[in-house]
Amino acid sequence: MDAFVYGTLRDPERARELLGHADFGPDALLRGLHRVDARYPTLAPGGKTQGRVLRLRDDDLEALDAYERVDRGLYVRVGVPGDQGALWTYVGDPTRLGAEVTWPGAGPFRRQVERYVDANDVRVES
């Protein structure tokens, strides 16, 4: 599965630095979530976000998870549907990033995001 990127990884030099390649698909639009600039960019319910499809290779998810600090709870990786198939994207925990964002529902942040994606028409269009 490829990834929808909306922050620093849209830059080919940054992607190449992290992954050793910068294989991009088309520019894309994520509907149902909008970008919020905080300590690092994140996504919030509603709106839309411009980004790119980053083509992933075998070990790329491990590198991306480390870059986004998934193990420390800074970001969560979630799957979103797309017109060319499902994609991964990363959503930053607003509490950890100092972002004024409210997600509906209760429970762990990952579950809040997953429930929102499932219950709303969140999707990537290229």
Predicted features along the sequence, with ranges:
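Glycine-aromatic micro-motifs
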Residues: M1-S126
